[in-house]
């Protein structure tokens, strides 16, 4: 949950969280918008019962029938580079396809961190796209990290240190390029 002066944004709803709306209301009394890093049920499952709208990358609409079949709310679309203004605090929407075609990272430039869902740092690399797309995504995110001096990306799961550093994103570029070139196999 990211809170500004006038609004709050919940990044991912998790799954099987009973009374998520009440839990969020116990933290903030501001209006809350739900955004998803991607549409897998471990990130959107609790949205079904508690949120009338969810904002996603339009590239992930292909996954709605499989991963969100019971969601009856309104699906709204984010745009790459969009600024979500919470009043005194903003998040930038950065499309980061890789884990899914519509994976998205939300960057808080002022705080120098981002929320990457399963795009970076979630402990394993389950690709929903090809390696060339992953390389493009990593290069794009690396440029955003450098431009805004982002210190960490916080992933959607806890496996180990639970944050991704700029160097590890660069390492993903090298690893992916080495796999594509045949330098690394296995």
Model-inferred region functions:
Residues 1-7, 17, 26, 48, ...:
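Zn-dependent metallo-beta-lactamase
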Residues 15-86, 178:
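Active-site HxH/HxHxD metal-binding segment of metal-dependent hydrolases
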Residues 7-10, 15-16, 90-180:
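Metallo-beta-lactamase
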Residues 1, 83-85, 105-107:
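Residue-level detector of beta-strand face positions
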Residues 1, 9-10, 33-35:
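Short, conserved beta-strand segments within well-ordered enzyme catalytic domains
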Residues 1, 22-25, 43-45, 104, ...:
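Short, flexible, glycine/charge-rich loop motifs used to bind or transfer phosphoryl groups or to couple energy/partner
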